[in-house]
UniProtKB/Swiss-Prot annotation:
Glycans are attached at residue 68. One of its GO terms (cellular component) is cytoplasm. It is found in: Secreted, Extracellular space; Cytoplasm; Endoplasmic reticulum. Carbohydrate-binding lectin with a preference for chitin. Has no chitinase activity. May play a role in tissue remodeling and in the capacity of cells to respond to and cope with changes in their environment. Plays a role in T-helper cell type 2 (Th2) inflammatory response and IL-13-induced inflammation, regulating allergen sensitization, inflammatory cell apoptosis, dendritic cell accumulation and M2 macrophage differentiation. Facilitates invasion of pathogenic enteric bacteria into colonic mucosa and lymphoid organs. This is Chitinase-3-like protein 1. Disruption phenotype: Mice are viable, fertile and appear normal, but have defective antigen-induced Th2 inflammatory responses and defective IL-13-induced responses, displaying accelerated cell death responses and diminished M2 macrophage differentiation. Mutant mice are more sensitive to S.pneumoniae infection, displaying enhanced mortality, exacerbated lung injury and decreased bacterial clearance compared to wild-type mice. Mutant mice also have an exacerbated response to hyperoxia, displaying enhanced protein leak, tissue inflammation and chemokine production and premature death. GO terms for molecular function: chitin binding. Residues 30-389 form the GH18 domain. Residues 1-29 form the signal peptide.
């Protein structure tokens, strides 16, 4: 009797241990993909950011933005010191052997025209595709991220072909003891851009994961204040605005054939700001233009989280109950941004939808110096990481 009780207790303990292990594995299965921008090194003073400032256990994947494509259609560096920064980034893997690094090619400055020229021409496309794996391997990267912003209607099939051929090349390039290179793409979350440039069902099957840019939904073109990354539709949203939220974009992508298990929800560490046109300062108030540039980022209409912390001193803070995001006003300035509460709500949503995880744009726009709260580094990214656990 005594022996069977012990056996049962032992079995129960083993099962409990197994359950805990399975839980840990399922929790750790979430990806936290974080972008780093090479131009952040040029910001003044405490705004300057280099890859060695990244905490090696913060993200599961780090994406270096951006690489270039040379005149002979080969993957190439962009900045004068990219090679040195590639080395700094990939050295983080000596401290965290599970960390994966990817190189993103393209971006806003690169433009859609050059991508179109390469993807639409078989000879150019083949040259580019064949150049990628040797380049990534030589610098120690684990994969490529495509940031074609954004394919036009005529490019839709070329974009699919480019992704398909890159995936085939990565499969062909695998050798014993060497993992297949990862392939991801940064996709717009705007309905018009999705409908115009992406065959979602086709590209999703060839990508390891999709970085859905669920931000920049609202801008100065609307001529009124609005949050650029609302989780849900707002009560006052017009017919067009009903598409401009995280919830709609995620569900739409899944409806079009993207597997939830490959979809990463983009969470911004930056805020979008506006200059108010009158004393009215609530959601939907008229604006005269973009907000004032930040002290370090120096870009009208955009503020890093560490600049927002400074703005919040003496500001009036509001929380949008439907959209689940905050905004703040001070004088004639209006800023929609993320905080720890809003990012936790977003992680709760992505878990509910069984998404692959979260993507962060960008590490250098989070409070990496710990200026908001002393010795609290990367507060938004860490809040996302904690909520994913």
């Amino acid at each position: 009797m005594h022996t069977s009780t012990e056996a049962r207790m032992g079995m129960r303990a083993a099962l409990t241990g197994f359950a805990v292990l399975m839980l840990l594995q399922s929790c750790s299965a979430y990806k936290l993909v974080c972008y780093f921008t090479s131009w952040s090194q040029y910001r003044e003073g405490v705004g300057s950011f280099l890859p060695d400032a990244i905490q090696p256990f913060l993200c599961t994947h780090i994406i270096y933005s951006f690489a270039n494509i040379s005149s002979d259609n080969m993957l190439s560096t962009w900045e004068w010191n990219d090679e040195s920064n590639y080395d700094k980034l990939n050295k983080l893997k000596t401290r965290n052997t599970n960390l994966k690094t990817l190189l993103s090619v393209g971006g806003w400055k690169f433009g859609e025209k050059r991508f179109s020229e390469i993807a639409s021409n078989t000879e150019r496309r083949t040259a580019f595709v064949r150049s990628v794996a040797p380049f990534l391997r030589s610098y120690g990267f684990d994969g490529l991220d495509l940031a074609w912003l954004y394919p036009r209607l005529r490019d839709k099939q070329y974009f699919s072909t480019l992704i398909k051929e890159l995936n085939a090349e990565f499969t062909k390039e695998v050798q014993p003891g060497r993992e297949k290179l990862l392939l991801s793409a940064a996709l717009s979350a705007g309905k018009v851009a999705i409908d115009t440039g992406y065959d979602i069902a086709q590209i999703a099957q060839h990508l390891d994961f999709i970085n859905l840019m669920t931000y920049d939904f609202h801008g100065v073109w609307r001529q009124i204040t609005g949050h650029h990354s609302p989780l849900f539709q707002g009560q006052k949203d017009t017919r067009f605005d009903r598409y401009s939220n995280v919830n709609y974009a995620v569900q739409y992508m899944i409806r079009l054939g993207a597997q939830a298990s490959k979809l990463l929800m983009g969470i911004p560490t930056f805020g979008k700001s506006f200059t108010l046109a009158s004393s009215e300062n609530q959601l939907g108030a008229p604006i005269s233009g973009e907000g004032l540039p930040g002290r370090f980022t120096k870009e009208a209409g955009t503020l890093a989280y560490y600049e927002i912390c400074d703005f919040l001193k003496g500001a009036e803070v509001h929380r949008l109950s439907n959209e689940k995001v905050p905004f703040a006003t001070k004088g004639n300035q209006w800023v929609g941004y993320e905080d720890k509460e809003s990012v936790k709500n977003k992680v709760g949503f992505l878990k509910e939808k069984k998404l692959a995880g979260a993507m962060v744009w960008a590490l250098d726009l989070d409070d990496f110096q710990g200026t908001c709260q002393p010795k609290e580094f990367f507060p938004l990214t860490n809040a996302i990481k904690d909520a994913l656990a």
